[in-house]
Amino acid sequence: SLDPKTRNGTGRNARIEFKGVPILYTPWISFPLGPQRKSGFLFPDIGLSSRNGAELTVPYYWNIAPNMDFTFAPAVYAKRGLDLSGEFRFMSTRQEALVDFNFLPRDRLTDSDRGRIYVEQRYQLPSRWQFTANATHVSDGQYYEDFAAGAENTSIPFAERFAELSY
């Protein structure tokens, strides 16, 4: 049902079919009827890799405020265990910030805690000056090899860090 007053829609027993075959089903779904953001679960991600085995990620999006949100995306890797992942975003008239992290306590394959954190910050300073800083830290040199989302990230020899002041 669609409710223009609350600008929300809901569905029961919703499914998506391809050539008459159901490929996605949900017993209940709620969604906004416009560009506004809404807290809730996002579509899960299912995968399979030789390094990690079967993978399942179930992200939850939290709309904290109009200028701030957080996505928590725990993932289960059959060969490695539970990975706690999140992304926090903040924006104001003079500032943007992003914190993206993963933490895998006690990786079953390496018997060690593993993780990554990436922080990005932009400040608009007075007189058209701008300060930008990015920093990445990984737990070990093999991290990107084991958890990179794409082939372009698997051969990164170092974690990037930089700061820049520009006019």
Predicted regions: what they are:
Residues 1-93, 98, 151-155, 159-167:
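Outer-membrane beta-barrel initiation region
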Residues 100-167:
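Flexible loop and strand-edge segments within Gram-negative outer membrane beta-barrel domains
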